[in-house]
Amino acid sequence: MRIFLAGAGGVIGRRLTPLLRAVGHTVVGTTRSPDKMAALRVLGAEPVVVDAFDADGLMRAFMAAKPDAVIHQLTDLPFPPDSPRYAEGLARNARLRVEGTRNLVAAAQAAGVKRMVAESIAFIYAPGPRARVETDKLKPPEGDSATTVNAVIALEQSVLSMPEGIVLRYGYLYGQGTWSGDTPHPPAIHADAAAHAAGLALTRAKPGIYNVAEDDPSLSSAKAKGDFGFDAAFRFSP
């Protein structure tokens, strides 16, 4: 298949591109920076410079790429959690989840694409007495978390409006290139395993929402394990 990978230069996108290529897919990978095009080519992608906020540019990119499916791995978190500008980064990321996802979905639908796999987050469930599953309620959108919760809801609604929309609610990412480094913070997911999950979901998952994280008392990923073989222990060979 021809895969339009939005966010190919990100932490997950850099891992996912070679996984997709290894099983025979062609990857059209996006970046906002012309400086990253060479790196994407090395990974095996056909690079496209486009900004998710540029609806017209994104539409042109889709029409030129003619993809069979879309994988959405876009994030915009330039500042670490201990930065005084972290709140600014959260606001930017929230806008990307809302507007960027909306533009991706519109372009995909215009290009006749039915299947989209998109990243979301698994750490905004309302507290409960057992491990949270995909049908459990999210936190109410209030206080400091309101912007993030509202943005996640908008992202998921947009993706699930696709005929074959698949949402992967990742735990806190860790591994090389993440803010957490090699230290997992539960519910956690290594970036290698997150990329592997997206690759599996592309062809195996049914439309819907999946938790994707390591075993944790607060979160169940049983649905992802059962439906498409999610393996939290997956790592690239050194």
Place the predicted regions along the sequence by residue.
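Alpha-helical substrate-binding/gating segment
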Residues: L173-G177, H185-Y210, D215
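Conserved beta-loop-beta element that borders a ligand/cofactor-binding pocket
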Residues: R115-F123, A154-Q176
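Rossmann-fold NAD(P)-dependent oxidoreductase module
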Residues: R15-L19, A107, S158
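C-terminal amphipathic/interface module of NAD(P)-dependent oxidoreductases
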Residues: E46, V50, A55, T203, ...
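NAD(P)H-binding glycine-rich loop region in Rossmannoid oxidoreductase-like domains
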Residues: R32-V98
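Catalytic loop of short-chain dehydrogenase/reductase
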Residues: Y125-Q157, Y174-D182
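N-terminal Rossmann NAD(P)H-binding glycine-rich loop of SDR-like oxidoreductase domains
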Residues: I3-H25
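Conserved Rossmann-fold NAD(P)-dependent oxidoreductase catalytic core, especially the SDR/UDP-sugar
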Residues: P81-D144
